Amino acid sequence: MSSKEQKMPDEQVSEDMEVVSEQQNSADKAEASETESVVDPRVAELEEQLKQAQQRERDAILRAKAEVENIRRRTEQDVEKAHKFALERFANELLPVIDNLERALEVADRTNTEIAPMVEGIELTLKSFLGAVGKFGIEVVGDTNVPFNPEIHQAMTMMESDQHEPNHVMMVMQKGYTLNGRLLRPAMVAVSK
């Protein structure tokens, strides 16, 4: 036998194997396409569920970040308020001292030359004291001829007046004070009708 004749059956076998392999591949492809069409709705459903879960997670992360930012902002505001109004209790204790210095000046006999240095000392002390508390944000509320404001004034009486417009402060009986814009004590006033 020649070598040519021996190759023939081997070639035949390899060709047969290729044909069988191609048939198997096409059968696998057909089966895969059938499987894809069967699995496709389920895969689509799972992909949709995955997208929804990812969106929920993104939303949860955004909400958590926003909440952290809100907490940080509130904490900063609380700290700022604590710094700003830490003196409130102390300032309330100082108000009677200011009132007493003002009353001392009101009743002092300014015509008596013997007590003139004392009156001048009280005036300077009051001025210095008001300057010192003013540096810390304490301001006086007690102007006359201004519109009555219930947020900073406490009306003690209402009086008829031709010299003042209606609902204006005519007289201040006791001055009020604010600390950085927050009312410490309202001004006690007489209001025109």
Swiss-Prot record:
NCBIfam families: PRK14139.1, PRK14140.1, PRK14150.1. It comes from the Bacteria. PROSITE patterns: GRPE. Residues 1-10 have a biased composition (Basic and acidic residues). GO terms for cellular component: cytosol. GO terms for molecular function: adenyl-nucleotide exchange factor activity; protein homodimerization activity; protein-folding chaperone binding; unfolded protein binding. GO terms for biological process: protein folding. Coiled coil: none annotated. Participates actively in the response to hyperosmotic and heat shock by preventing the aggregation of stress-denatured proteins, in association with DnaK and GrpE. It is the nucleotide exchange factor for DnaK and may function as a thermosensor. Unfolded proteins bind initially to DnaJ; upon interaction with the DnaJ-bound protein, DnaK hydrolyzes its bound ATP, resulting in the formation of a stable complex. GrpE releases ADP from DnaK; ATP binding to DnaK triggers the release of the substrate protein, thus completing the reaction cycle. CDD domains: GrpE. It is found in: Cytoplasm. This is Protein GrpE. Belongs to the GrpE family. The gene is grpE. Keywords: Chaperone, Cytoplasm, Stress response. The keyword Chaperone applies. It holds the Pfam family GrpE. Residues 1-45 are annotated as: Disordered. Homodimer. InterPro entries: GrpE, GrpE_coiled_coil, GrpE_head.
